[in-house]
């Protein structure tokens, strides 16, 4: 006779983790199929699944798509007066990474941590270190909230722009025709600041995306530039069986229709053998021209799209949700109203940490899933280069051994210089496995600004949302404990603290023996007058009162009952 899970939970000795200390690893999906969790999320509570299109449903191939964007932007700059020599540059995917900051004063690309501390500094193709860095950043620190000076290149669309900025700075710094200055460069009596150069690049990028031929060239060769995944129709059809599915993209309808038609262009439907369905049938609501992040605030006027011409119909749409109708503009409130959903009912899936994830989380309370295509490469290095991580751990052990028997009375000063040099060398080798700017998420032991934003705003993240295919819709994505150093480096073994050695040991806030505590309180209050407050002492909770990030709101459950 089999034992139920509820019976097994009564006895800790029968728990799987106690039967096998490595049990948890056995239940995990393959790394490349995993969805990673920052905040617990119960999938069965999700009533609506929302999608961005660019770099989410439609993943653009790298480096082909970035190369196209780079070439078109360079051509635009040359057409407005920049040197012809720039046409010789070609996009190099090994240099840029997302999350870099461009300093418009000094023309530097910076990699920083969550607090603005410098991790990497590059002026053009030249990596700056030590005293040279401190001349411009005395504390190796920047004020991230100075958005007039510092621009964060956070999106996948920013990658060509990031590399182009490095190319321009390097060219104007080293070309003999120009005189390099601290905040720009001179050509005779003409001065160009890095701020002006940056603005020219921004304007050129916007022109390429909105007025140029980027979309036209993409559509002309979809097979070259867009990833097509046969599992997409299957996942969306399964989502539609358990909830509602909507698309909210900044792209216009004509471009959206061509991209989505290609993504769903299979001879079959969701499964082999089923009949083909148009892409629109996989969504309950389709919304284009969203203008995110404005979409998550006041939004714009909601209008209806004429799908035959791609033009907008006159007037504001005020009716109920109609299947087969494509809408333009609107806001996140509009989506909630049309779908009859509230914030936490919605899981929004996108790639833009600011436009998709941060704003939907902060302004609407939507649950968030961040798509990070670079995660596949990050995981590859993490697993394939494990020897480097193991060597760093070994070097830490060497350091600990040198200091093992020393305390504040010791005059001995171990020579750790060789170990420090080796740590730096191994850390550098590890960083270079990711690319010239290192990992998207860290530099050595320190997490990047991008990593901190992922942890702060994305409830879930993965290399692709297709990974949801490998989980049931009843799944509880449970967040792992985020350990502080005193937790991650101290074993779970009982240690008797000597109160004579450590006066802090008396700061015990737990009531170990409630009967003894009650007796002491009784002794303390015997002589107090009968006129006293209703409650002299708090009582230790006998039921769960703390929020443990399990995504199990008891009030909601009671309402449903």
Swiss-Prot record:
Origin species: Homo sapiens (Human)
Residues holding GMP: 52, 54, 202, 206, 215, 249-250, 292
Protein name: Cytosolic purine 5'-nucleotidase
Assembly behavior: Homotetramer.
EC number: 3.1.3.5, 3.1.3.99, 2.7.1.77
Main location: cytoplasm
Gene Ontology MF annotations: 5'-nucleotidase activity; ATP binding; GMP 5'-nucleotidase activity; identical protein binding; IMP 5'-nucleotidase activity; metal ion binding; nucleoside phosphotransferase activity; ubiquitin protein ligase activity
Activity control, per UniProt: Allosterically activated by various compounds including ATP, 2,3-BPG/2,3-Bisphosphoglyceric acid and Ap4A/P1,P4-bis(5'-adenosyl) tetraphosphate. Binding of an allosteric activator is a prerequisiste to magnesium and substrate binding. Inhibited by inorganic phosphate.
Binding positions (adenosine 1): 154, 453
Pfam families: 5_nucleotid
Record disease entry: Spastic paraplegia 45, autosomal recessive: A form of spastic paraplegia, a neurodegenerative disorder characterized by a slow, gradual, progressive weakness and spasticity of the lower limbs. Rate of progression and the severity of symptoms are quite variable. Initial symptoms may include difficulty with balance, weakness and stiffness in the legs, muscle spasms, and dragging the toes when walking. In some forms of the disorder, bladder symptoms (such as incontinence) may appear, or the weakness and stiffness may spread to other parts of the body.
One GO cellular component term noted in the UniProt record for this chain: cytosol
Upper classification of the organism: Eukaryota, Metazoa, Chordata, Craniata, Vertebrata
Key word Ribosomal protein present: no
Tissue specificity statement from the Swiss-Prot or TrEMBL entry: Widely expressed.
Binding site for IMP: 52, 54, 202, 206, 215, 249-251, 292
Listed Acidic residues bias regions: 550-561
Subcellular location: Cytoplasm, Cytosol
Binding sites annotated in the UniProt record for P(1),P(4)-bis(5'-adenosyl) tetraphosphate: 154, 362, 453, 457
This protein's UniProt keywords: Allosteric enzyme, ATP-binding, Cytoplasm, Disease variant, Hereditary spastic paraplegia, Hydrolase, Magnesium, Metal-binding, Neurodegeneration, Nucleotide metabolism, Nucleotide-binding, Phosphoprotein, Transferase
Job of this protein: Broad specificity cytosolic 5'-nucleotidase that catalyzes the dephosphorylation of 6-hydroxypurine nucleoside 5'-monophosphates. In addition, possesses a phosphotransferase activity by which it can transfer a phosphate from a donor nucleoside monophosphate to an acceptor nucleoside, preferably inosine, deoxyinosine and guanosine. Has the highest activities for IMP and GMP followed by dIMP, dGMP and XMP. Could also catalyze the transfer of phosphates from pyrimidine monophosphates but with lower efficiency.
Stretches that traverse the bilayer: none
Domain of life of the native organism: Eukaryota
Keyword ATP-binding in annotation: yes
Binding, (2R)-2,3-bisphosphoglycerate: 144, 362, 457
GO biological process: adenosine metabolic process; allantoin metabolic process; amide catabolic process; dGMP catabolic process; dGMP metabolic process; GMP catabolic process to guanine; GMP metabolic process; IMP catabolic process
Required for tetramer assembly as annotated region, ranges: 548-561
Region (Disordered): 538-561
């Amino acid at each position: 006779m089999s034992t139920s899970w509820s019976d097994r939970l009564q006895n800790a000795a029968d728990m799987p983790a106690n039967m096998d200390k490595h049990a948890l690893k056995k239940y995990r999906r393959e790394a490349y199929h995993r969805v990673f969790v920052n905040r617990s999320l119960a999938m069965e509570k999700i009533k609506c699944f929302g999608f961005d299109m660019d770099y989410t449903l439609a993943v653009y191939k790298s480096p082909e798509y970035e190369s196209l964007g780079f070439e078109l932007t360079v051509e635009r700059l040359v057409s407005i007066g920049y040197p012809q020599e720039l046409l010789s540059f070609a996009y190099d995917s090994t240099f840029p990474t997302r999350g870099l900051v461009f300093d418009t004063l000094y023309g530097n690309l910076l990699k920083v941590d969550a607090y603005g501390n410098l991790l990497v500094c590059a002026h053009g193709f030249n990596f700056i270190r030590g005293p040279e860095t401190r001349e411009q950043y005395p504390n190796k620190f920047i004020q991230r909230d100075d958005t007039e000076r510092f621009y964060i290149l956070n999106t996948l669309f920013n990658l060509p722009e990031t590399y182009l900025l490095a190319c321009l700075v390097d060219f104007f710094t080293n070309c003999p025709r120009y005189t390099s200055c601290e905040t720009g460069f001179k050509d005779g009596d003409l001065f160009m600041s890095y701020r002006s150069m940056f603005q020219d690049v921004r304007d050129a990028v916007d022109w390429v995306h909105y007025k140029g031929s980027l979309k036209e060239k993409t559509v002309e060769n979809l097979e070259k530039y867009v990833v097509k995944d046969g599992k997409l129709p299957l996942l969306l059809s399964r989502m539609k069986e358990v909830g509602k599915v909507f698309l909210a993209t900044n792209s216009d309808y004509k471009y959206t229709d061509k991209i989505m038609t290609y993504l769903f262009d299979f001879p079959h439907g969701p499964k082999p053998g089923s009949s083909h369905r148009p892409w629109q049938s996989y969504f309950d609501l389709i919304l284009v021209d969203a203008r995110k992040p404005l979409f998550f605030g006041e939004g714009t006027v909601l209008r209806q799209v004429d799908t035959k011409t791609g033009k907008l119909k006159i007037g504001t749409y005020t009716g109920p949700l109609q299947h087969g109708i494509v809408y333009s503009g609107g806001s996140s409130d509009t989506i909630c109203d049309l779908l009859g959903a509230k914030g936490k009912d919605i899981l929004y899936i996108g790639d833009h940490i600011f436009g998709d994830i941060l704003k939907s989380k902060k302004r609407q309370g939507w649950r968030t899933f961040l798509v990070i295509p670079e995660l596949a490469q990050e995981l590859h290095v993490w697993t394939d280069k494990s020897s480097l991580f193991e060597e760093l751990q070994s070097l830490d052990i060497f350091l600990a051994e040198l200091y093992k028997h020393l305390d504040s009375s010791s005059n001995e000063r171990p020579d750790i210089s060789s170990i420090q040099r080796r740590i730096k060398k191994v850390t550098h080798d590890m960083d270079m496995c990711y690319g010239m700017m290192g990992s998207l998420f860290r530099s050595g032991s320190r997490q990047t600004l991008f990593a901190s934003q992922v942890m702060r705003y994305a409830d879930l993240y993965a290399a692709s949302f297709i990974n949801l295919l490998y989980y049931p819709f009843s799944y509880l994505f449970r967040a792992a404990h985020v350990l502080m150093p005193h937790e991650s480096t101290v074993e779970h073994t009982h240690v008797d603290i000597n109160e004579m050695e450590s006066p802090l040991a008396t700061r015990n806030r737990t009531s170990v023996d409630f009967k003894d505590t009650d007796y002491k309180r009784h002794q303390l209050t015997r002589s107090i007058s009968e006129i006293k407050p209703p409650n002299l002492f708090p009582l230790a909770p006998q039921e769960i009162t703390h929020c443990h990030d399990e995504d199990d709101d008891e009030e909601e459950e009671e309402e449903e009952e």
